[in-house]
Amino acid sequence: MVARGETRSAALLAVALQVLIRDGYDRFSMDSVAALAHASKTTIYRRWSNKAELIKAALDAHDASFNDEVFDTGGLRTDLIATMGMLRRKAQALPPTLYPDLIRAMEHDETLSDAIRRHLADPGLSPFDAPLSRAVGRGEAGVDVDRQLIHDVAEAMLTHRLTLGGPLDDAFIGRLVDDVLLVLIRPGAR
């Protein structure tokens, strides 16, 4: 039985992600979430108006839970390595077919397309915001650092590596941080 209030919402979102992983987008339904969560459909619809919004909220909660793992290591390079390590764990926590399934569904479902775009564009979900803010405060990065570019490049490189089946090992993360991200953050520092 799912608890009440915020705990209930968090539990429903965890179940929704579980159903999405198990069934894929096309077979995902509010009924399946309600059944697995031992909750009423009314409880779910009171919080999320449709399945696209529920999926967005579940992905938001998933990302936010991993972002909580990023802590201050005391330096920009080590903060970036810690952030990339977290992104690796986040990527490995989901099946590699999840996002391609959602992207295919976005082609013919405008509601889902809008929800996923809002999820991906939410600056509050960027794991790079806190480390870059700390770096600016420590004088390791300029106030004009392009946070969105750093996020986009890091996730694109990670996604590319996952798609090709290449290793997401510490060596790759170190090269990505040293040869790409730090160069973008501090041009001319090499």
UniProtKB/Swiss-Prot annotation:
GO biological process, one term: response to antibiotic
Keyword Transcription regulation included in the entry's annotation: yes
Xref: InterPro entries: DNA-bd_HTH_TetR-type_CS (IPR023772), Homeodomain-like_sf (IPR009057), HTH-type_TetR-like_transc_reg (IPR050109), HTH_TetR (IPR001647), Tet_transcr_reg_TetR-rel_C_sf (IPR036271), TetR_C (IPR011075)
One MF annotation (Gene Ontology) recorded for this entry: DNA-binding transcription factor activity
Cross-referenced Gene3D superfamilies: Homeodomain-like, Tetracycline Repressor, domain 2
Keywords linked to the UniProt accession: Antibiotic resistance, DNA-binding, Repressor, Transcription, Transcription regulation
Job description of the protein: Binds to its own palindromic promoter and represses transcription of its operon; addition of tetracycline or doxycycline (but not tigecycline) interferes with DNA binding. Addition of TetX to the DNA-TetR-antibiotic complex restores DNA binding.
PANTHER family, A to Z: HTH-TYPE TRANSCRIPTIONAL REGULATOR RUTR, TETR-FAMILY TRANSCRIPTIONAL REGULATOR
Protein name: DNA-binding transcriptional repressor TetR
Organism: Mycobacteroides abscessus (strain ATCC 19977 / DSM 44196 / CCUG 20993 / CIP 104536 / JCM 13569 / NCTC 13031 / TMC 1543 / L948)
Source taxonomy: Bacteria, Bacillati, Actinomycetota, Actinomycetes, Mycobacteriales
Gene: tetR
